[in-house]
Amino acid sequence: MPQRTIRILPISDIYLERRKLKEIPTLDQSFDVLACAGDLCEGQPEMAIQSAVALARGKPAIIVAGNQDLYTNGPEDRRTISEFHRLLRNEAERQNARAHRDIVTVLSADDPVCELGQVRFIGVTLWTDWAQASRWVPNQEAPKCHEMCAAEARSLAGHWRSGPREYRAIRTERGPWTPLDAVAEHGRERAILLDALAGYHHGPTVVITHHAPLANCADVYRGRGVPWWAPAFYGSELLPALPEEMRPDLWVFGHVHAAFDVQCGRTRAIANPVEGGQFNPRLVVELELDRQPD
């Protein structure tokens, strides 16, 4: 009998630089595909791929890079974002060659789409546009407030004293990664996602990104000592902005270290991070496949 459903297990924010693979709870083995939404292992792209393969246990794993997958290991480490992506792809190719089949796929802005049977997977890191900086700011209705908050947030985030470590730990060919680089890359990746979603596909579509497509997922941190501009760092409002007919069936993301599972129109949006203590190893999402003629 033909397969009628596909079962996807989402996972993200594994941080193998902090924990051993054996410390991760055993995954429900009923899944068909492991969807890895980034931050597998800081600065060690080969280990990131190898760990995903180990967790999947011979089943397909589909991966996007998280911000911390692209961190260098100190000022003497000159690897750039492009180099990290190349190393991730190379290790995936080695693993596939060893298995004599495609057991792991890395999706990125340069290669964002793959298909497994009837299911289309689209994946990018989805850096944020920094437009959500005013989310927690009172009187945020005025457009001027949005722009001013975003500009101030980018300035604070880009400063070595007050900003996230990624702006010291990630490198480009031009130098250190900056909030403006993130804004530019968000625009590029947003266009790539939209173009892919606009293409015809007969069957379910799953999007995998590291950063969140819904800004409200950052609200779990409100009042917990994080900067006022934190929503801008964690996500954008890309999913609500999409027309209903372009929305995927499932959107898997990470970056926020809290479980998240909501419905946005036809899309179920899920984060299932290992970091944060809320990981559910039995969270398997079942999508119906189109019935084929008998």
What residues fall within each predicted segment?
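N-terminal active-site segment of His-dependent metallophosphoesterases
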Residues: 1-64, 68-77
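Short coil/turn segments at beta-strand junctions that form active-site/ligand-binding loops
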Residues: 6, 32, 59-60, 117, ...
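A basic- and aromatic-enriched beta-loop-alpha substructure that forms the phosphate/nucleotide-
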Residues: 60-138
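A structural motif corresponding to the C-terminal end of an alpha-helix
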Residues: 91-105, 192-204, 240-250
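Active-site-proximal loop/helix segment associated with metal-binding centers of metalloenzymes
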Residues: 122-206, 211-229
